[in-house]
Amino acid sequence: MAVKIRLTRMGSKKKPFYRINVADSRAPRDGRFIETVGTYNPLVAENQVTLKEDRILDWLSKGAQPSDTVRNLLSKAGVMTKFHDQKFSK
């Protein structure tokens, strides 16, 4: 099973709000997911992002692939650097 970390759109028309979910890559964008690991609100001035870093690092170590947008959000939050250090420190 190929697992992706990607955004799921929530909110109403013209007011998007996103959850960062871990889901099977074959599932629809807003369909079934395994776990919610964060949120992203692009409408706030500083683009509010909340993350469960320990769960994200766990899923990345298990082989989950982040989407391009999620990879950018994780990089800005410093999670990808932690994952890289954790992976190559062995």
Swiss-Prot record:
It comes from the Bacteria. Transmembrane segments: none annotated. Keywords: Ribonucleoprotein, Ribosomal protein. Disulfide bonds: none annotated. InterPro entries: Ribosomal_bS16, Ribosomal_bS16_dom_sf. GO terms for biological process: translation. The keyword Ribosomal protein applies. One of its GO terms (molecular function) is structural constituent of ribosome. It holds the Pfam family Ribosomal_S16. One of its GO terms (cellular component) is small ribosomal subunit. HAMAP family: Ribosomal_bS16. Belongs to the bacterial ribosomal protein bS16 family. NCBIfam families: S16. This is Small ribosomal subunit protein bS16.
